[in-house]
Structures are given as structure tokens and as C-alpha cells.
């Protein structure tokens, strides 16, 4: 028994998991939000729906978004007209693009993360790949392993259909892997596309317009490991704790269903109110061990699900106007990229902290929170510790 305890102890790291590198990628096709209503209704042959187009234009104007990136091209939509219909039977066409583009975009982000990390990709021991697009067997984790040229013995985990909160999920999983497998280095990749969800408008499904106004494509990758070797590695953030919570009375608030028509997403109007009404519970539980209850004393990495969610979080917690600056910037420049979005915010936080001459990667603060929100309603809460920025 003693030898088993020794073996178990030998497998565990000495310290907490750390984020060692971040990389991001977006498709080349850029759509300006101001022009998108005209483009969307033209491509879906819905210009006769003038009242619906006015509603959509209002949604876009209030979205906080300046531009978005999507893998869909005008040529693809013209060649696959069923995709542009509201409920056209188009799953095959969507799958054909998603199973290729999901790992390809993820690879772009992973290459950047590994380059920043500075170590050989053969040192990657685990791979977590997350996406709500292109369900296939073998999955995007397998495809990325081949494209990137990872060791064939890399331990893979594929996380499908979790939605917008999963940026926090993959960090929680990576933390557990890194801290319980001494010397491991975990490559985390979130790659999300609108290929499954893009569809034309319908007067009978106004809630679908919200997703069409907000969602975008993007991939983010991280390298996570415990006990970084300071001679060759540098921590960006430490993952102090990670938890998940289902919010009460939120059944059916956000749902997604795979059908012959693709992935249909349904959003209830009270989603922002449900999040804001319950957000203090996971916050209090996460920061109670640290004795922190002033939410303006920490830095914020919040999934920018939409402007209403961010506004209500600010109001509920009494956050200063600049607290969600990183989230609002990512929402403006990229839109809602589902699970990868909060990792873009993390990258923006460290980059902006450096550019602004702050003393830490958390805007000069030591402690921070990463929030993922999504179907369930589910909240992922990750407590972060920043690191000093060397002058």
C-alpha cells in the first residue's frame, strides 16, 4: 500500500497548472457588421421580408460588434442553396465544410501557441479539442494530431456540443490533467464555426435572428502545464481553481439540436436576466477561500455572449466601466465565437496589460476570474492568478 501511495504522489505535480502560451486564428472572410443585414438578406433571398430585415438591422446595431470572421464564402452559399434556407435539408453540405475547417482552423491557432511556448511539439503529452461543429469519427482531435504532426501516443480527448461555456470546461479539464500527470504538457484547442447554425430568416423563428447577428468563427489554443521550467518556459496565468454550476430555473433557456437542417439554436429572452440573477453564487464560492468579495479588485475574463449579458453583469455586481473592457473588445472585433471566445479575451487581457505597461498580466491585479456561460444554463468559473510582467 505504501508503494501505491508513493506512486500516486510521484504522478502529481508540485504546484498548480499554468497557461504557458496562447494562440488564436480566424478565417480570412471578414464581414462588417454595418453591412451584414444587407448581405444576409440578399444571400438568403429574403429581401422581401422587410419588417424582419428591420428587426435584424436593429439587432446588429445593438450587438456591440464591428466585424466578424466566417469560413462561409459567397461562392459556397451559392453552390449550396439549401444552407441559406431557414430549414433547408443541408446537414451534408454543412458537415462537408465543418469536418475540414474545424481542425484546419484549430491547427492555425495551435501552431501559434506552440511557437510561443517555444518547445518541440513532441513534448505535448495530452490534447483536448473542443468544438460544436463537424461531429465525425475519428474526430477533429485525430485530424489535428495528424495535421500538426503530434506524437501518435498523445492522449486525446474530444469535447463536442458544449457551446459557449466550454472555454472554461477545457481549462478545468486541462488543469486536472496537468496536475495529476507530472511533467505533462496539455495542448488545448477550441475551434468553432457557424457552418452548422447559419440559416435564412423566418417570421416564425425570430429568436434565430439573435444567433445570426452574433455568432462568428474562430479558434484558440493554449499550452497548459504545471511546474514550468523557468529556464525554457514562462507562465502567463496560474489556474488556481475551477468549478461548474447549473443555474436554477434555467431549463430550456439555451438549446441546440442537430437536425437534417443543421444545428438549430434556440434562445429565450430572459437568458441575460438568468445569468445576472445567479452570477454572484459561483463567484462567492470560488473566492471565499481567498477572502475576496470586492469584484472590482479582480480582473475579468468573461465570455462576451452578447451585450445584454455583459451589461447586466456590470449592473448586478457594480463593476466599473473598464472591468469588462477585454470582453467588449473581443465582442467588437470578432463576435461570439462560442467556446473559443473567452480564450480570445484571455489573450486580449495579457496583450493589453503588456501594452499598457501594467505590472501583471491581469491589468496590474493579482487575482482574476474566467467565466464561461452557455446551455444548461451552465456557468464555468476559473480562478486565475496573474504573473508579473518583466520590465
Curated annotation (Swiss-Prot):
Residues annotated as catalytic: 164
EC no. given is: 2.3.1.159
Family named by the database record: Belongs to the thiolase-like superfamily. Chalcone/stilbene synthases family.
Looking up InterPro entries in the UniProt record yields: Chalcone/stilbene_synt_C, Chalcone/stilbene_synt_N, Chalcone/stilbene_synthase_AS, Polyketide_synthase_type-III, Thiolase-like
Keywords tagged on the record:
Acyltransferase, Flavonoid biosynthesis, Transferase
UniProt cross-references to Pfam families, sorted A to Z:
Chal_sti_synt_C, Chal_sti_synt_N
Q: Which reaction does it catalyse?
A: N-methylanthraniloyl-CoA + 3 malonyl-CoA + 3 H(+) = 1,3-dihydroxy-N-methylacridone + 3 CO2 + 4 CoA + H2O
Gene (UniProt): ACS4
List the Gene3D superfamilies. 3.40.47.10
Query: One GO BP annotation here?
Result: flavonoid biosynthetic process
In this UniProt entry, which cysteines form S-S bonds?
A: none
Could you tell me what this protein is called?
A: Probable acridone synthase 4
Any one GO molecular function term: acridone synthase activity
Amino acid at each position: 500500500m505504501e508503494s501505491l501511495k508513493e506512486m500516486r504522489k510521484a504522478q502529481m505535480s508540485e504546484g498548480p497548472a499554468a497557461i504557458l502560451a496562447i494562440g488564436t486564428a480566424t478565417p480570412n472572410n471578414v464581414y462588417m457588421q454595418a453591412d451584414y443585414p444587407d448581405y444576409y438578406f440578399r444571400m438568403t433571398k429574403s429581401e422581401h421580408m422587410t419588417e424582419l430585415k428591420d428587426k435584424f438591422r436593429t439587432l446588429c446595431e445593438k450587438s456591440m460588434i464591428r466585424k466578424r470572421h466566417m469560413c462561409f464564402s459567397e461562392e459556397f452559399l451559392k453552390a449550396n442553396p439549401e444552407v441559406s434556407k431557414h430549414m433547408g435539408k443541408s446537414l451534408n453540405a454543412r458537415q462537408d465544410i465543418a469536418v475540414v475547417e474545424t481542425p484546419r482552423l484549430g491547427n492555425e491557432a495551435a501552431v501559434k501557441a506552440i511557437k510561443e511556448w517555444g518547445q518541440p511539439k513532441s513534448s505535448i503529452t495530452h490534447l483536448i479539442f473542443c468544438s460544436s461543429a463537424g461531429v465525425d469519427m475519428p474526430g477533429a482531435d485525430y485530424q489535428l494530431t495528424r495535421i500538426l504532426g503530434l506524437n501518435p501516443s498523445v492522449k486525446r480527448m474530444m469535447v463536442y456540443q458544449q457551446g459557449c461555456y466550454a472555454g472554461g470546461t477545457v481549462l478545468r479539464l486541462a488543469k486536472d490533467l496537468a496536475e495529476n500527470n507530472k511533467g505533462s504538457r496539455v495542448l488545448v484547442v477550441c475551434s468553432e464555426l457557424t457552418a452548422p447554425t447559419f440559416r435564412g430568416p423566418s417570421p416564425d423563428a425570430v429568436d434565430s435572428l439573435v444567433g445570426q447577428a452574433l455568432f462568428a468563427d474562430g479558434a484558440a489554443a493554449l499550452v497548459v502545464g504545471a511546474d514550468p521550467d523557468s529556464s525554457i518556459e514562462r507562465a502567463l496565468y496560474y489556474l488556481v481553481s475551477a468549478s461548474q454550476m447549473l443555474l436554477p430555473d434555467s431549463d430550456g433557456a439555451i438549446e441546440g439540436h442537430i437536425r437534417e437542417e443543421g444545428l438549430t439554436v434556440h434562445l429565450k429572452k430572459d437568458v441575460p436576466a438568468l445569468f445576472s440573477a445567479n452570477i454572484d453564487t459561483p463567484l462567492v464560492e470560488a473566492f471565499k477561500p481567498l477572502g475576496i468579495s470586492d469584484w472590482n479588485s479582480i480582473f475579468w475574463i468573461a465570455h462576451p455572449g452578447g451585450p445584454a449579458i455583459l451589461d447586466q453583469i456590470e449592473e448586478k455586481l457594480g463593476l466599473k466601466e473598464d472591468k469588462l473592457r477585454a470582453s467588449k473588445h473581443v465582442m467588437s472585433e470578432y463576435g461570439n465565437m462560442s467556446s473559443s471566445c473567452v480564450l480570445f479575451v484571455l489573450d486580449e487581457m495579457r496583450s493589453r496589460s503588456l501594452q499598457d505597461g501594467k505590472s501583471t498580466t491581469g491589468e496590474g491585479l493579482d487575482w482574476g476570474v474566467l467565466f464561461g456561460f452557455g446551455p444548461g444554463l451552465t456557468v464555468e468559473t476559473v480562478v486565475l492568478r496573474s504573473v508579473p510582467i518583466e520590465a
